[in-house]
Amino acid sequence: MEQLTTLPRLGDPGAMEPWALPAWQHWTQGQGCKPGDASASIAATPTALQVKGLRFEESSEPAGAHSPGPIRNTDPEGTETVLPKLGQQAESPGYSCSRLEGEDAQAYKAKFNIGFGDRPNLELLRALGELQQHCTILKEENQMLRKSSFPETEEKVRRLKRKNAELAVIAKRLEERAQKLQETNMRGGEVPLCPDPDPVWSCARKALARQRARDLSETATALLAKDKQNAALQRECRELQARLSLVGKEGPQWLHMRDFDRLLRESQREVLRLQRQIALRNQREPLRPARSQGSTAPSSVGAPAPGAPGETVLEDDVESPQVVLGEPEKQLRVQQLESELCKKRKKCESLEQEARKKQRRCEELELQLRAAQNENARLVEENSRLSGKATEKEQVEWENAELKGQLLGVTQERDSALRKSQGLQSKLESLEQVLEHMRKVAQRRQQLEEEHEQARLSLQEKQEEVRRLQQAQAEAKREHEGAVQLLESTLDSMQARVRELEGQCRSQTERFSLLAQELQAFRLHPGPLDLLTSALGCNALGDHPPPHCCCSSPQPCQGSGPKDLDLPPGSPGRCTPKSSEPALATLTGVPRRTAKKAESLSNSSRSESIHNSPKSCPTPEVDTASEVEELEVDSVSLLPAAPEGHSGGGARIQVFLARYSYNPFEGPNENPEAELPLTAGEYIYIYGNMDEDGFFEGELMDGRRGLVPSNFVERVSDDDLLSTLPRELADSSHSSGPELSFLSGGGGGCSSGGQSSGGRSQPRPEEEATGDELSLSPPPEGLGEPLAVPYPRHITVLKQLAHSVVLAWELPPERVDLRGFHIFVNGELRQALGPGVPPKAVLENMDLRAGPLHVSVQALTSKGSSDPLRCCLAMGAGAGVVPSQLRIHRLTATSAEITWVPGNSNLAHAVYLNGEECPPARPSTYWATFCNLRPGTLYQARVEAQIPSQGPWEPGWERPELRAATLQFTTLPAGLPDAPLDVQAEPGPSPGIVMISWLPVTIDAAGTSNGVRVTGYAVYADGQKIMEVASPTAGSVLVEVSQLQLLQACHEVTVRTMSPHGESTDSIPAPVAPALASACQPARMSCLSPRPSPEVRTPLASVSPGLGYTSLPLRHPVPHGTQDSPASLSTEMSKGPQEEPPVPCSQEEAGSAVHRTSEEKRAMEPTLGQEGPDPVAPFLAKQAVECTSGDAGPTPCSTQEELTQKEPSTEVCHRGDLDSELKLRSEKEGMSELGVHLVNSLVDHSRNSDLSDIQEEEEEEEEEEELGSRPWSFQKQVAGNSIGENGAKPQPDPSCETDSDEEILEQILELPLQRLCSKKLFSIPEEEEEEDEEEGLGKPGPSSSSQDPSQPERALLGLDCESSQPQGPGLCPLSPELSGAREHLEDVLGVVGGNSRRRGGCSPEKLPNRKRPQDPREHCSRLLGNGGPQTSARPVPPRDRGSLPVIEGTRVGQEPGGRGRPGLSRRCPRGPAPESSLVSCLSPKCLEISIEYDSEDEQEVGSGGVSISSSCYPTDGEAWGTAAVGRPRGPVKVNSGSNTYLRLPAWEKGEPERRGRSAIGRTKEPPSRATETGESRGQDNSGRRGPQRRGARVLRTGTTELAPPRSPQEAPSHQDLPLRVFVALFDYDPISMSPNPDAGEEELPFREGQILKVFGDKDADGFYRGESGGRTGYIPCNMVAEVAVDTPTGRQQLLQRGFLPPNVLTQGSGNGPSVYPSAHTPGPPPKPRRSKKVELEDPAQLCPGPPKLIHSAALKTSRPMVAAFDYNPRENSPNMDVEAELPFRAGDVITVFGNMDDDGFYYGELNGQRGLVPSNFLEGPGPEAGGLDSGTSQAESQRTRRRRVQC
C-alpha cells in the first residue's frame, strides 16, 4: 500500500496548519468556478480523504449514513446542484490542476491580496496530489474488484462514491463562497485604490496577488497529489478487499475502517472550516479599521457547520468593504494586518510543524497498519494451511486405524496359511522320502532281477561254451588227424607245385625286371611311377590273402588254399592261393636292385627291384605266392604301396602342410631359387623322400615345384585326409570290414586326394553335394539339413489369388528316395504331399493381405527331412526379398556365425562385414561365418538379397536398402589358448627315456588359438614345470634321464599351451608310472616272448626288416585253422608286451609278422627283391623303431625276425635273412637305440621344425651321427641299401631323412628285403610312392631283406607286419612279447618311423605314429592305405595304446602308415596282442574299433587304414591290395600327406575279394588307374571321387590317383577265373579319366550303379578283368565295389538287372546284392586347409581356417565341376573363415573360375553364391555332363593328389 498523507484528526481544528488553508477563498466565479462546477482538485481532496479513511469496505456507519443519496446543494444563487458520484469525480483527477494553472494570474492576485504564504499552499497542494494518487489507485482497485464481481466491494464503492459526491458538493460550496469572498475583497480593494493610490498599498496588493497565485498553484498541486493518493488508496483498498475476500474471513482490520471514515469526515469538516476562516480573513484584511468585522468573521468561520447562515455572513462581509476608509485608517489597517499577518505566519508555521508531526505519526500508523495487515494475512494463510493439515491428519488417522484392522486380519490368515504350509511340507517331505525309498527298492529289485537274468544267461552261455569247446576239441582232434594225413598225402604234390611255382616266380621276376626298367624310365615322371610302385608295395603288404606275395605282409592265407583264412572268397581278408602264388612268384622272380635317390623317388623302380629280388621269395611257397600275387598284383601292390609311402618313394606323392611361412631368399642356402616359398597353412605336394639336406621335392598348389625344407612342413596324415570323408563313408567304414577297407583304401585315397588337392576335401558327386552348404559356411547347429538330405529347389508362385496360392518347385537334383513333401506356412504345417506327387501345391485360405507369409517346402526322403529354410519364399502384403531374423548364431573371439531367414531361397545373398564384401551365400543358404575376426571388436554384418540379372523384379527391389538386413555384434574378448589334447606318457625309444606326447591345439594361419598366438607347450609334472617346447605345432617331447628322476616321483604329467598372454589350463593329466616302468626296464626282444605257432612265426620270419610287413609274407601258407588267427596273434602279441613290455618292436613285429605271414607266403619272395619291400620295411622299421622306443625292449627283434622265426621254426626271433653279425640282442639294442635315436631326432626335429629346416636338418644330422655311432647301427646295415635305393640318401622316409632315425630306417630298409616283400607292392604307383618312402627308409628292400633281416628291420617289419597283420589270422602270431614289442616298435616307429614317415611323408619333424603306438593293423592299414609315412604329416593323438604322439603334432604311425594303419591301430591294439590284434585288425570290428579310437590319423586309417585292416584279411589278398591301392592311388599321396585319393581296398569299396588284390594289385596297376581312380576314387571314396578324371589322366605310375596305371602282368584268362559281381561306384570314362594310353581300347567305360562282371582278382595295377555290355576289358578297382550275392540266382538276377540304385550301393539285403561301398561310403576328402595346419580331428571338429576371399576381379575363365562330396565348411573346413567357402552337396555343379590357389581352393559359384571351393571335393563333370573333360575337371580339382602321385 502506498502511504497516505497524514490528516489532522477529526474535531481538532487547531491541528490544521496554515499551509492547509488553500486559496479557495480567492477562487471566484470569474476564475471559472461557476456554481455547480465542482473543482476537480477540491472534489478530489474530500474523495481522497474519504477513500483514505475508508480503506476497507467495512464502516461503522450504515451504508446510507454518509451518503443517503446524491447530495443536493444550493449555491448562492439558489441553483440546486447535483454533485457527481465518486466514479465520475475520479474520472478526471487532473482537471483541477489544469484549471488552476489557467487561473494563475487571478490566483496570484488573490493570494497577493490574501497575503497567504507559499509554503503552506505548496504543502497542501502536495498533500492533495498524493490524495489524488491514492484516489486513482483506489479507483483502479475498485475497477478490479468490480471486474472480479465482488458484490460487497461494489456496495462499498457505491457508498464511497456517495460520500465523495457529498464532499464534492461541500467543496463546491466552499469554492463558491471563496470566490464570492474574493470578489468582495477585490471590490473592496478597488474602491480604496482609486481614491488612494498609495504605492505601498499597491506593492502590498501585488505581493499578495503573487503570493495568492503561488498559494493557489500550490494548493492545486496539493489537491492533485491528494487526488492521486486517493486513487491509489482506492486501488489499495480494492486489493485488500480482494485479498480479504479470498481469505473468506473478516479480520480485525475492519475496525480501522471506521476510524478512517471518521478521520476523513473530520478532515473534510476541518477543510471546510479552514476555508471559511480564510474567506473571513480575506474579507477582514482589506478592511483594516473594521476589526469588529474581522472578529465577526472568525467567529463566523469557526461555525462548525457550513450552512446558509455562514454564507449569509460572508456575503455581508463581502459587502462591508464597500465602506470607504480614510488614509490614517488605512495605514492603521495596514499595520494591523501586517501584525496580524505576522501572527498568522507564526501560527501557520506552528501548524505546519504540528501537521508534519501528525503526518509522521500518520505514516508510522500506516506502517504499523500494513505490518498488522501482512501479519494478519500470513496468519490467515497459516491458519488455513494448518486447518487443511489437521483435516488430512484426521483422515490419515482414520485410514491408519482401518488398515491396522485389515493388517491384523491378514496377519492372522497368513499365520494360519504358514502353519498349513508347514504341515503340508512336512507331509510332502515324508512322502518324498517314502517315494525315494520305494524307488530305490524298485531299482534295486530291477537291478537284482537283471543281475539274476544276466547270471542265468551267463551260466547258460558258459555251459553252452563248455559244450562247444568239448565238441570243438573233439572236432579239432579229428581234424588234426585228418590234416596230418592230408598233409602227408599232399606233401609230394605240394613239392611239385612248389617247384612249378618257383619256375613261375623266376619268369615273373624276369617280367618284373622289365617292368622295373620301364618304371625306371618313368621315374622321370615320379607321380605315376610312384603310384605304381607304391601300389605294388601296398599290394604286397595289403594282400594278406596271397600268402606268397612277397610284397604283402605276412599273409594270413597262404598260397596253400582258402584254408589259410576262413574269410569268404569275396571277403577282403581272403586271398586265393593261386592268384597270390603266381603274384608272389612273379615278385620273387624280380631281382632286387638298389635304387638311387631318384629311384627311391620312383615307386615303380622299387616295386621293380622288389620283384626282381629272388630273395624276396626264398621258398617255393613264396614263388607260389608270387604266382598268386601275379593274379592279385593289385592288392599286393597296394599293400606295399603304403609301406613305400612310408619309405618315401621318390615318385610317391604326399600332402604336406606348411607350418610356417618360408622365404628361400631370406634363408642361408646358396640356391634359394631352387626352393619354394611357403605360406603357413598351405598344402604342398611332396614327391619322394627327404634328401640328406633335409629338403623335399615338392609342388605348390599353383603348380610351382622346387625344394621344400622338411622342418617347415608337416605331413598331412591320412586320418586328417579321411576325416573329411562323407558321413556315409564314415558310417560305412565303421560298419563292416569291407567297408572299412574301402574307406582305408578308397577312402584313404579320397581323403588323401582331397588333401593333395589343396588340403580341402573334395565334395561328393552332385547327388550329395549341394552347393548351398558351402556358400559361406556350414549351416549352424540346428540350421539346415544334414548334408545327406537333399532339398527341393527353385520354389516359385505359379498363381496367386486373393486367398490362395499355387506353388511349384523343383525336385532335389540328388538321387534320393522321395517320400513326399511338407509345405509350411509361417512354420506351421499347412499341407503334406505323398510320394510320387508332382512338385506343386495349392495353398488355400491364406490371408495374403494381413501381412507377409513365409512359405517353405520340406522334402521327406529316406535320409530324413530336408531343411525347410532351404526352399522358402515370402509372399503376401509387405513381403519382399529382404532377409529377416538376422541374428548371431555362434560367436567366438575370432569368428562369428550369422543366420537369417531368406525372403526368397532362390536368391543368393551378398554378405558384407564392416562394408567389405564377403563370399556370397548361395541360394538356399541362410548362414554365413566370419573368421579371422579380432577379439572384442564391434562388427557390422549386412546380408543383402541379390536380385537376378534376369527375371521379374518387384518394385523397390532395385533399392539395396530394401533388400538388406544389418546386424551388429561384438566378438568375445580373447582368452587363453586351448589346452592340448590326448596327453600321454609313453616309454621312449630307448631305456631311460620317456616320451610325453600330445595333440597340439588347432591354430589358424596366423598361429593363434582362441585369439592368441601359440608359442609352444609347457610340460608339467605334478604341477611343476619340467620342460618347455617352443613350437606351436610340437606334438611330443622326450624326457631325458636327468629329468626322469624328477618324473619318477610324480604321478601324472600335464601339458599347457603357451602364449604371450599366458598359459592355457592344464590338459587332461596322463599317468607317468607305466611309462616310467617301461622306460626303466631293459629292452627285451619280444621275440623272446612265447613264440607264435611255427606257421605264424614262419611268416614273420619271412618278413624282411627292410620290407617291413612286406617282407613278412609267410613262407608257409598258414591256413586259418592252422595259423594263429589274428585274434590269437593279437593275443600272443598282447602277451608279448605284457610279458616283455620293453619289446615294442616285437609287438609291432608280431603284428607285422602276423600280417606278413599271410602275405609273406604270397608276396614274400618277390618283395624281398624289390623296392616295395623296402618301402614297407622302412615303414616297418619305423614302426619297429617306434615299438623299440616305446618299449625300449627287444625292438631289435623285428617282425622280420619274427617272420623268420615263424618261417623256419618256433623260434621267436629267427634272423634267417638278417646278417649273422646282427644278433638278436644286438638287433634289439640296435632297434632300441634306433628307435630312441629316431624318436629323439624326430622329436628334435619336431621341436626345431618350428623355426628353420636348417636347424632341424642339423639336429637330424647330429642324430644321424649319433645313430651311426651307436653300437648297433641299424643305419649302417640299412644305410647302404636305403641309400642305394633311395638314391644314396638315407631317407627311407621323409621323416627319417636327416635324422639318424631316418638314416637308420633307411639302412634298415636297405637291408635285403626278405621274401616277405612283394613285388606287387611296388607295382601300384601309390604303393610305389609309399615304397619310395619306405625305400627312403630301406629302399634297398631286396638288399635289406637279403642282406640281413635284422631285428631292427624286423622291428620295422614288425611295424609293417602290424600294418600287414590285419591281413589275416593266418599271419604268424607273434609271441606276446613280440606282439608287445611290435606294439612298442610300432610306437617307436610311430615316433621314429613315424617321423621317418613324416619325413618320408614329407613331414620331417612329425612322428605320425608317435602320438600313439600303432597296431600292426595300423601299420598294415597305413602301409596299405598310405604307403607308409604319408599319414605322418599330421599330428595324431596317441592311438589305442597311446603311442608316442607325433612330436611336431604330426602323426607318426598313421600318416606314415597311411590311414589304413591308424584305422587299424584303433581297432587293433598296436602291438600287445599279435594274433588277436591281427584278427581284430582283419575283422571289420577291429577296423571299426580302430577308426573309433584313432585320432585323425587313426580316422584316416579308419578310412584308409581301416581298409587296410580289412585288407589285412587274407581272403582275397585284395583287401590288402585294395587298401593299399585305394590308398596308393590316393593314399600314396596320403602317405605323402596328400593322398586323399587313396583307393580303398576292394572289399572296403565293397569288393570283399579285392582285398588282397586291391591293396596290392590295385595300387600297382591302379596307380595309374588307381591313381586316377584312386585319386578320383579317393575322391570317390571320400565322396564319389572315384572316377577321378584327374587320376585317370595321371600317369599310371602315380600321376593320376584315379585309375591306377596297369602294369603289364600276366593274368590268367578270365574264363578260368571265378565270376564276381561288382557295381560301379562312379561314372568312368577311360578315354578321359584313365592315364593309360590304351585305356580306350583295354578299359571298360561304365556308369555309376552299373553291374559289372569281374573275373578273378585285380591285377598288380589295381585293375580287374571284367565284362560289360558284351565287351571285356579292365576295370579300375577303386571305381567299383563288389556286390555280395548269396545265391547264383540272385547273381543272375543282378546281372540281368544291370544297375543298382545309389541307395542300394551301401546296403546289403539278404540274398540281394550287398555292396561293400568303397566309393559311395567313403568319407569326404580330408578337410581342406587354407594356409593352416590341419589337426587330426573330425572335419566337424576342425576349426576352419581363414579362407582366402577371391574377388570378381581375380576371376578367370570359368568351367563347371561336379561336387564329389557333401561339403559343409563349418563341419569340414579346418579354416577359420568358413564363411568364405561355399557349402555344397554331392552332385552339385559348381562353376569354377580360374586356377586352384596355393591352398588347393577354387573360387567358384553355386546357385548364385560365390566363394572358395576345396578342389579335393570336386571332380570334373562326368561324360554325361558334357562339360569339361572329366579328366580335366577332376584332374584340376584333384590336382594336388595327382601331383603327389605324378611327381
Curated annotation (Swiss-Prot):
It comes from the Eukaryota. Residues 294-310, 600-613, 1340-1352 have a biased composition (Low complexity). Residues 1253-1266, 1296-1305, 1325-1335 have a biased composition (Acidic residues). Residues 789-880, 882-974, 979-1077 form the Fibronectin type-III domain. PROSITE patterns: FN3, SH3. GO terms for cellular component: calyx of Held; cytoplasm; glutamatergic synapse; mitochondrion. Pfam families: SH3_2, SH3_9. Residues 57-81, 282-318, 560-626, 728-787, 1107-1174, 1191-1215, 1240-1307, 1322-1478, 1514-1616, 1701-1747, 1818-1847 are annotated as: Disordered. Residues 1122-1133, 1272-1284 have a biased composition (Polar residues). Specifically expressed in brain. High expression level in the limbic system such as the nucleus accumbens, septum, and hippocampus, as well as on the cerebellum and pineal gland. Abundant in the CA1 region of the hippocampus. Belongs to the RIMBP family. Required for synaptic transmission regulation. It probably controls the recruitement of voltage-gated calcium channels to the presynaptic membrane, and modulates neurotransmitter release. This is Peripheral-type benzodiazepine receptor-associated protein 1. It comes from Rattus norvegicus. The gene is Tspoap1.
